[in-house]
Amino acid sequence: MQQKKTFAILLSLAMIVTIVLGNGTFVSAATTEAITGISYYVDSVNGNDDNDGTSEAKAWKSLEKVNATTFKPGDELRFKRGCSWSGLLSPKGSGEKGNPITIDAYGDVKDGRPVINGDSWCGDKGDDLENRVFNTAVYFYNQEYWEITSIEVTNHTKTKDDHIKKYGILIMGQDAGTLHEINVKNTYVHDVISIPIGQQAGIGRGGIVYAIRGNKKATNWEDITVEGNYVKNVNHYGINFISTWGSSTFPDESGITEGGGGTYRSKNLVIRSNYCENVGNAAICPSDYENALIEYNVANGCNSGPNGNVPIWWEHGQKTICQYNEVFGSGASGDKE
């Protein structure tokens, strides 16, 4: 009798701990709970930062509330369509393999994308050789396992800050080792306008930028996808990867002076199905990597600045596949198509 009771208890525990999927795969309940995460909603019109943010009816309001929150694996951060925010979006935390944190939109698709306008926000951890500041609308620092999608990003104001080098989305790693899977998909990044390109070619700045800085601990990216983005009216680079842990970092143009003293390439980059239009320099330029797939991208009217160069090019890379891309309408300066 005691043996039957013990078996029944063990069987019950097994049923609680294990879920059997239709295909016969066994997944622990703990794993299922982690994947679920929490969905947070942000509404700049009807939200309130005193809310818990976990439903559309109890949405947060401000970027300040978002930036003060450390998100966990499986969480979703959802911005309401038709709303806009001015300032910096810089959420904290990291996801995990197979369980990223997601930025997405909610609401009626006819209302357009939620808009993040950098609007002259400046940080003090910059790489600018002259001013030691940077200006960006979206910023991640030493984080990994994020999916950034469905938002609109802009960063242009007609003020004295136009001479600060600007970014749309800046993803930075510094003295952190290998950082994985911060993916940017289906975003609209436009009007990232700053210092005139004639003064500096702006390598390492632009619409969507992955930047490795520092010289103390070798740092790189691994398994990064940039896909389906529309990048328009950017007077530096459209999509750019650059690192201090490479052989050539163009210090006169990028402002990078703290070279790592060795080579530590990023691995497995996918740059696919992006449309870059009216970009002052290159539409796409990865550097310091091993294994890159660059395919099905369009560069329309790029290389339009006085110091522009080839609309799609790469530097200090190994095992590059560049295929099925389209380039047209390039400017007359610098290198050509």
PLM regions and their residue ranges:
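Bacterial N-terminal signal peptides that target proteins for export
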Residues: M1-L10
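Hydrophobic core
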Residues: L11, M15-I19
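Sec-dependent signal peptide cleavage junction
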Residues: I19-E33
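Boundary/junction segments of secreted and surface-exposed precursor proteins
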Residues: E33-S44
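Acidic Gly/Asp/Thr-rich repetitive segments characteristic of extracellular carbohydrate-active
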Residues: V42-K80, S84-W85, L89
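Right-handed parallel beta-helix/beta-spiral solenoid domain characteristic of secreted/periplasmic
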Residues: R78, S94-H163, D191-I197
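Glycine-rich beta-solenoid repeat tracts in large extracellular/virion proteins
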Residues: G87-G95, P114-V115, D119, T136-N142, ...
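Right-handed parallel beta-helix
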Residues: P100, E144-N155, T178-I193, A218-Y237, ...
